[in-house]
């Protein structure tokens, strides 16, 4: 047994060394096959001799049993956000404020990694808990998923009690591989590495997270008691010595001009990095000076985040293609010479509508400027007329639908052209894709390509046909083995139990969004009651406007739609509201029964998180301010809604006041 114990220790040392070389230094000394061989040897030993499995074993990286959900845990110290700077003037004002308070200052400049903030707690040197940022006060416990990240040490080099914070992210090569795999499986692609990292960390099965090859950079320590550091730079050096991965592209500078030089350098070099960054973080380096400056209610006074402007690149417009949405809107899409924008290769971009094409004088063959709106959605910003080649073609939208040949119309007050043929194949397919989407019936495994195959094979002609599919229908399809068929049929069966609001949104009624679907489902509770409702009744409901009311009634009066609903009923698709009615929630008197409007940017939680919490307390969250509004919660840059609330004398809370009230209830 002594020999076996010695071999286990040797395997630990080798696997930890090879893992560090591969994931942290990006300089492996052995091939993947050698690492895999040693890992499987250790797994086998631990299976046969469980007494040799330790909490810091390299086999923990593989992932464990799936969880039912993530627990909510309060942070020992709130994870605050940083104030933002968008230009040189903002940075110089920040510098002036710092110098007025503490005099001469040295800054620490660090890359702002575009990922997900996490907090890691160590007890006696062992990693025991990892949380998401959440709303800054409370995060989700994702410890098992974080253990699969090789850049996070399961055991520190010193037996310290400490909490560190960092940014979990997905390297670009991992992102590309993941999307290639999803494309092969006809699954929805991730828009960017940040979304992919967030989605991977929220997997209930940590084995799936382990396959995603995430990484992390640690950027701060929560308590400096066990550290000899006197500055942020020394703290990062200490973290390196303890086995953490910090970002080495940091710099100490003596003044704001040094900050600007650092920003200029990484603005031009950001694409050379193997991961995405979305800005630069500037901190007062001296820890005593940080303490002297302190915090506001939502951020440290001694730090600021400079946000990069949206990156713009030039490429060639090769062609313009048209797509038809589920409501018949015809949208022009630019076909581009492939170009890298904000870390991903772009070959298609939105042109929105014909008016935009003409207003921006965009012609086929032009050199055009492309950017990603919010670093996510590619769009053509403008053409470059001075580089226009001879023969560049002015684009004109067709007069008839490219899918069904029906005449296109422009409805009064709209800029888009629309196909109004209810039997247009392109619209029907898009409607099917919408029906199975996540916010609708959420049928996992029924992707675009499979739906197109099913439609072309005449196995489905409407959404109800999905619930009539059999194993015999699905097995002959491309890339549909027995396991995928079994999983898909199980997902279809599960979708029958969705609540009424999922079905309403999935039907694709024009103007009826997720929130309005929820409102109608909660109000009428069953589809049968909705079938008898009048337009006059609907417009009386808050959040249901004239357009929505007219559209819903017209849709549900259609005999074909009523036949479709009966067809769904025949397959036992649920048509009853399953949620808890707001009026039935016994929330806190501070919130219960009140109509509340959220406006402006929130920093300590998302608008969606705030809305859900308010609903859980019996409040009704609406989108517009009226005389019936009880409270307006105003975040940063609150605009006309705040002004209207002030004019009506409505009670106004800041985000911090709202958070304080939440904390009072939770205490």
From Swiss-Prot:
Its EC number is 6.5.1.2. GO terms for molecular function: DNA binding; DNA ligase (NAD+) activity; metal ion binding. Residues 586-667 form the BRCT domain. Keywords: DNA damage, DNA repair, DNA replication, Ligase, Magnesium, Manganese, Metal-binding, NAD, Zinc. It catalyses: NAD(+) + (deoxyribonucleotide)n-3'-hydroxyl + 5'-phospho-(deoxyribonucleotide)m = (deoxyribonucleotide)n+m + AMP + beta-nicotinamide D-nucleotide. It comes from the Bacteria. It is an enzyme of class 6 (ligase). NAD(+) binds at residues 32-36, 81-82, 110, 133, 167, 283, 307. GO terms for biological process: DNA repair; DNA replication. The active site is at residue 112. InterPro entries: BRCT_dom, BRCT_dom_sf, DisA/LigA_HHH, DNA_ligase, DNA_ligase_AS, DNA_ligase_CS, DNAligase_adenylation, DNAligase_N. Its cofactor is Mg(2+); Mn(2+). Zn(2+) binds at residues 401, 404, 419, 424. Gene3D superfamilies: 5' to 3' exonuclease, C-terminal subdomain, 6.20.10.30, BRCT domain, DNA ligase/mRNA capping enzyme, Helix hairpin bin, Nucleic acid-binding proteins. Pfam families: BRCT, DNA_ligase_aden, DNA_ligase_OB, DNA_ligase_ZBD, HHH_2. GO terms for cellular component: cytosol. The keyword NAD applies. DNA ligase that catalyzes the formation of phosphodiester linkages between 5'-phosphoryl and 3'-hydroxyl groups in double-stranded DNA using NAD as a coenzyme and as the energy source for the reaction. It is essential for DNA replication and repair of damaged DNA. Belongs to the NAD-dependent DNA ligase family. LigA subfamily. NCBIfam families: dnlj, PRK07956.1. PANTHER family: CHROMOSOME TRANSMISSION FIDELITY FACTOR 18 (PTHR23389), DNA LIGASE (PTHR23389:SF9). This is DNA ligase. It comes from Staphylococcus aureus (strain bovine RF122 / ET3-1).
């Amino acid at each position: 047994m002594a020999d076996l114990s010695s071999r286990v220790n040797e395997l630990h040392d080798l696997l930890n060394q090879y893992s560090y070389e591969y994931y942290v230094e990006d300089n492996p000394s052995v091939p993947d096959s050698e690492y895999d061989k040693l890992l499987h040897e250790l797994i086998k030993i631990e299976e046969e001799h469980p007494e040799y499995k330790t909490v810091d074993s390299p086999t923990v990286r593989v992932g464990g049993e799936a969880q039912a959900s993530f627990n909510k845990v309060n942070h020992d110290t709130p994870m605050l956000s940083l104030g933002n700077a968008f230009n040189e003037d903002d940075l110089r004002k920040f510098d002036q404020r710092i110098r007025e308070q503490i005099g001469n200052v040295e800054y620490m400049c660090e890359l702002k990694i575009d990922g997900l903030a996490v907090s890691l707690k160590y007890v006696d040197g062992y990693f025991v808990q990892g949380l998401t940022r959440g709303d800054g006060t409370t995060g989700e416990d994702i410890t098992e998923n974080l253990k699969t990240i090789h850049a996070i040490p399961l055991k520190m080099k010193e037996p310290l009690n400490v909490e560190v914070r960092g940014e979990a992210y997905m390297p670009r090569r991992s992102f590309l591989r993941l999307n290639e795999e999803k494309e092969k499986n006809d699954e929805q692609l991730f828009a960017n590495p940040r979304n992919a990292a967030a989605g991977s960390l929220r997997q209930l099965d940590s084995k799936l997270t382990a396959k995603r090859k995430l990484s992390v950079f640690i950027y701060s320590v929560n308590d400096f008691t066990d550290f000899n550091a006197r500055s942020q730079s020394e703290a990062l050096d200490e973290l390196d010595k303890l086995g953490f991965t910090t970002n080495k592209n940091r710099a100490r500078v003596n003044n704001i001009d040094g900050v600007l030089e650092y920003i200029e350098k990484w603005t031009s070099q950001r694409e050379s990095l193997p991961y995405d960054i979305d800005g630069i973080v500037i901190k007062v380096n001296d820890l005593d000076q940080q303490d002297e400056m302190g915090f506001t209610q939502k951020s440290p006074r001694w730090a600021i985040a400079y946000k990069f402007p949206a990156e713009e690149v030039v490429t060639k417009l090769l062609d313009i293609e048209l797509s038809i949405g589920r409501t018949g809107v015809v949208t022009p899409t630019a076909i581009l010479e492939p170009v890298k924008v904000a870390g991903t290769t772009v070959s298609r971009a939105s042109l929105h509508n014909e008016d935009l094409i003409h207003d921006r004088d965009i012609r086929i063959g032009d050199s055009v400027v492309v950017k990603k709106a919010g670093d996510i959605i590619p769009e053509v910003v403008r053409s470059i007329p001075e580089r226009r080649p001879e023969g560049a073609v002015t684009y004109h939208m067709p007069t008839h639908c490219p899918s069904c040949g029906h005449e296109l119309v422009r409805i009064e007050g709209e800029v888009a052209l629309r196909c109004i043929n209810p039997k247009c194949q392109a619209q029907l397919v898009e409607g099917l894709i919408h029906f199975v989407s996540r916010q609708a019936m959420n049928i996992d495994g029924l992707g675009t390509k499979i739906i197109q195959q099913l439609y072309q094979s005449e196995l489905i002609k409407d959404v109800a046909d999905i619930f009539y599919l059999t194993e015999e229908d699905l097995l002959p399809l491309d890339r549909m083995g027995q396991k995928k068929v079994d999983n898909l049929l199980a997902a279809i069966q599960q979708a029958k139990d969705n609540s009424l609001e999922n079905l309403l949104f999935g039907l694709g009624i024009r103007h009826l969004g997720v929130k309005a679907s929820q409102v109608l489902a909660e109000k009428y509770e069953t589809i049968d009651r909705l079938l008898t409702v009048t337009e006059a009744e609907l417009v009386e409901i808050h959040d249901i406007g004239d357009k929505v009311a007219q559209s819903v009634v017209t849709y549900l009066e259609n005999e074909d739609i009523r036949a479709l609903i009966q067809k769904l009923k025949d397959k036992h698709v649920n048509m009853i509201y399953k949620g808890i009615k707001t009026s039935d929630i016994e929330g806190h008197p501070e919130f219960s029964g009140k109509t509340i409007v959220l406006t402006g940017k929130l920093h300590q939680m998302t608008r969606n998180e705030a809305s859900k919490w308010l609903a859980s307390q019996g409040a009704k969250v609406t989108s517009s301010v009226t005389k019936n509004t009880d409270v307006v919660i105003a975040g940063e840059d609150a605009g006309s809604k705040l002004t209207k609330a002030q004019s009506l004398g409505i009670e106004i809370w800041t985000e911090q006041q709202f958070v304080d009230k939440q904390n009072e209830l939770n205490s």
